[in-house]
A protein has these predicted regions:
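Binuclear metal-dependent hydrolase catalytic cores centered on His/Asp/Glu-rich metal-binding motifs
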Residues: 39-40, 114, 127-174, 178-190, ...
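Beta-strand-turn-beta hairpins that frame and shape the catalytic cleft
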Residues: 8-19, 115-116, 123-134, 164-171, ...
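Catalytic metal-binding/acid-base residues of hydrolase active sites
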Residues: 25, 58-59, 93-95, 123-124, ...
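N-terminal active-site segment of His-dependent metallophosphoesterases
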Residues: 1-75
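Extended active-site neighborhood of metal-dependent phosphoesterases/phosphodiesterases
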Residues: 6, 73-159, 229, 236-240
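Active-site neighborhood of divalent metal-dependent phosphoester/pyrophosphate hydrolases
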Residues: 23-27, 47-69, 84-106, 130, ...
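Charged helix-capping and loop-helix junction motifs
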Residues: 34-37, 66-77, 102-107, 185-191, ...
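Conserved beta-sheet core of the metallophosphoesterase superfamily
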Residues: 178-267
Length: 276
């Protein structure tokens, strides 16, 4: 399902279209995936997309990166999909949880693709009236502290990007939405840093089929690490002055036709509009 959203802000000087995707879970054993179908569905709109933002889990496991053929296929796959459009990525748990394979390995592979920028925890991309940052907590957050907002806060406060310009529309890409939403609800000054929009994924819509999402009102059935009834599993949520967009998955981790048919693929075309 392609969702279309609009957000207006006095900080936006010229309208922009962003393609937002998450949880692609590319792996070497699954050749046909939903990213191809997604691209076909939006082919008439794609030329109007200004930037592509990917909020993690680009691959299923870094273990596949020991295969040179998979690396070549991954590069070609991303180049074909993005068609040279500026693309910004923050890594997810599946991108960095590879036992002895360091997260820098994927980061270095992505650096070889000219139009793609994998954002580490120190960079701010300034593009006229917007800025884009990425935040990836370390793998211990996912393995030992998943959903622990205090651990997330410690790591986020070490997030060494330059101070956000309050006159720009500031976007943060991060994979897991749960902790940052809860922190923002408690005290907007802790986590806000003048952030206007947070793009995340990770939740796979809480395994709620698309037809039931309006009824469930952002809640999921099951979240990552078998968490039951997560509060924030999909959709757009505004807390204080920050909008949070929780994306569903492009590809399910369960590679079965019946699952794929039930849940489909998920992407959002977001228009940032200037206030007239």
């Amino acid at each position: 399902m392609i969702k279309r959203l609009e957000i207006s802000s006095p900080k936006i000087k010229t309208d922009k279209k962003l393609l937002l995707i998450s949880d692609i879970h590319k792996n070497k054993n699954h050749k046909k995936d939903n990213l191809i179908k997604l691209k076909e569905e939006i082919k008439n709109e794609f030329k109007y997309i200004d930037y592509i933002l990917i909020s993690g889990d680009l691959i299923d496991t870094p273990k596949d990166l020991v295969d040179e053929e998979f690396i070549k296929e991954l590069k070609y796959y991303l180049e074909e999909f993005t068609e040279g459009k500026k693309t910004y990525i923050a890594l997810g748990n599946h991108d960095i949880d590879g036992n002895n394979i360091e997260e820098e390995y994927l980061y270095n592979i992505l650096k070889e693709i000219k139009n793609i920028k994998c954002l580490n925890n120190t960079e701010t991309i300034n593009i006229r009236d917007i800025s884009i940052q990425g935040f990836t907590p370390n793998i211990d957050y996912y393995r030992k502290h998943h959903g622990n907002k205090n651990e997330y806060k410690i790591q986020f406060e070490e997030h060494k990007t330059e101070k956000n310009d309050k006159n720009k529309y500031n976007i943060l890409i991060t994979h897991d939405p749960s902790s940052i939403i809860e922190l923002n609800m408690e005290n907007k000054e802790i986590i806000n840093k003048n952030i206007d929009l947070v793009i995340s994924g990770h939740m796979h819509n809480g395994l709620v089929p698309q037809k039931l999402q309006k009824i469930m009102n952002h809640k999921g059935f099951v979240g990552p690490y078998k968490k039951v009834l997560p509060k924030y599993a999909y959709g757009i949520i505004k807390i204080n002055e920050t909008n949070f967009i929780i994306l569903g998955a492009v590809n399910s981790m369960i590679k079965m036709p019946v699952v794929n048919k039930l849940y489909g693929y998920d992407a959002t075309i977001l228009t940032l509009k200037k206030v007239k």
